[in-house]
């Protein structure tokens, strides 16, 4: 089944492999994404009338808010960008304006489409690269030679190509012509400045300018791959498709939305620009036209997912108009000791599996006893209770501390099996978790 055509149940089943619990949040995301697919199956006139129901996710850091949205965008190949609301300033102040999040989305969308096109042409690109390098390594065939010599040259070229593909000649150096690196355009500036940037680049930088470079065959493969890709790809078609996809199926995840809420608890320490950022954000979420370097994009069919911990403020502290643009709200549960244990043992790419794979590169086999995993979950949970609650992110810190010496002295353990026991976990973490000051500064 096409990933774009996943049913809500299939979406939740997929998310269950990577994220423990948070059933309600998974359900909301699954329905919202399925509705994108449903809308695209309707006739054009009705499509325009149906706008996405934006979601507000409420929960502490590290409980899975970002991961749920990111995983879904990845599996369904949707244009996705994650931004932090606290990084923006209202128009007229120094800093990033909120429209830049839409430009970032379009950039990601175009890159996504470009990579898909490159994947389709992968074999053709690699063949062209190998042929070009082979011709550089072989002396050119003189004109007017016999058919027999031409056949010999063709056979030599074929053998040379096979050796290049197999990596036998990766260290050999060759001189090739490569196009000058194009100048990057800052897409976060206002449209007027963006156009000035593009015009200046056209004047001072010619795309066709090339320079000679001496590279290894391995480096030449990558340099030529990028160049040949550009000649084979239809850049205009990619830009148009990227714009269209961002417009119809893009997802913008706005984290830390609570940081721009105006809380009565803050009293006189209120930042006057917070409401300004909310008001600047409002037309984008409601639906407006944003200019990007690839063209204009309408934002009314982009799905916005906002998230925040709301420890110092409440969702009702956002301006009413913005609250109304996030009609679906879901609260994510805090992580218990049991959930911590499940995260370590039941997720498809758990932190434990990641560390085991990393150390296996050094020839070290790491095994965790079940009691050790339970102790890790318990101590991580306790550390969250005594210090700032950072959710599942605490597990990275505690496991890193337990495996610190083994990771550093990995070559001494090469070819051995190392078992992580409950006693080892306690010896590494017990005193740290017991001391509240040490928890704050070390864990």
Swiss-Prot record:
Signal sequence region: none
Taxonomic lineage of the native organism: Bacteria, Pseudomonadati, Campylobacterota, Epsilonproteobacteria, Campylobacterales
Highest taxon of source: Bacteria
Encoding gene, per UniProt annotation: hslU
Xref: Pfam families: AAA (PF00004), AAA_2 (PF07724)
Protein's recorded name: ATP-dependent protease ATPase subunit HslU
Residues that hold ATP according to the record: 20, 62-67, 255, 321, 393
Subcellular location, principal: cytoplasm
Keyword Cytoplasm carried by entry: yes
């Amino acid at each position: 089944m096409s990933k774009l055509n996943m049913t809500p149940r299939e979406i939740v089943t997929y998310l269950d492999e990577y994220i423990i619990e948070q059933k309600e949040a998974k359900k909301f995301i699954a329905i919202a994404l399925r509705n994108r697919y449903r809308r695209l199956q309707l006739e054009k006139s009705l499509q325009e009338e149906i706008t996405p129901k934006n979601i507000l996710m409420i929960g502490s850091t590290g409980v899975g808010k970002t991961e749920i949205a990111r995983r879904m965008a990845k599996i369904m190949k949707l244009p996705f960008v994650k931004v932090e609301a606290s990084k923006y300033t209202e128009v007229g102040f120094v800093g990033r304006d909120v429209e830049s999040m839409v430009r970032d989305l379009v950039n990601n969308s175009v890159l996504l489409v470009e990579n898909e096109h490159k994947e389709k042409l992968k074999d053709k690109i690699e063949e062209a690269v190998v042929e070009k390098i082979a011709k550089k390594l072989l002396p050119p065939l003189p004109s007017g030679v016999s058919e027999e010599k031409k056949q010999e040259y063709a056979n030599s070229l074929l053998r040379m190509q096979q050796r290049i593909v197999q990596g036998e000649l990766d260290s050999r150096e060759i001189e090739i012509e490569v196009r000058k690196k194009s100048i990057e355009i800052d897409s976060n500036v206002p449209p007027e400045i963006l156009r000035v940037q593009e015009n200046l680049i056209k004047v001072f930088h010619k795309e066709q300018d090339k320079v000679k470079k001496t590279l290894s065959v391995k480096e030449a493969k990558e340099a030529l791959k990028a160049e040949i890709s550009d000649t084979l790809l239809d850049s205009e078609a990619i830009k148009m498709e990227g714009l269209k996809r961002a417009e119809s199926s893009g997802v913008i995840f706005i984290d830390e939305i609570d940081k721009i809420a105006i809380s009565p608890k803050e009293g006189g320490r209120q930042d006057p620009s917070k409401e300004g950022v909310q008001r600047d954000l409002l037309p984008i979420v409601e639906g407006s036209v944003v200019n990007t370097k690839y063209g204009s994009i309408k934002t009314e069919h982009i799905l916005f997912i906002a998230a925040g911990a709301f420890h110092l403020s409440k969702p009702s502290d956002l301006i009413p108009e913005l609250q109304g643009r996030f009609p679906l709200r879901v609260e994510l549960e805090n992580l218990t000791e049991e959930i911590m244990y499940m995260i370590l043992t039941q997720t498809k790419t758990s932190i434990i599996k990641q560390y085991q794979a990393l150390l296996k590169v050094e020839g070290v086999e790491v095994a965790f006893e079940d009691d050790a995993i339970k102790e890790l979950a318990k101590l991580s949970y306790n550390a969250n209770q005594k210090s700032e609650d950072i959710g599942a992110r605490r597990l990275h810190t505690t496991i890193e501390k337990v495996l610190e010496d083994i990771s550093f002295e990995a070559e001494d353990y090469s070819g051995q099996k190392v078992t992580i026991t409950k006693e080892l976990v306690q010896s590494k973490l017990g005193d740290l978790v017991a001391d509240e000051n040490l928890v704050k500064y070390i864990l």
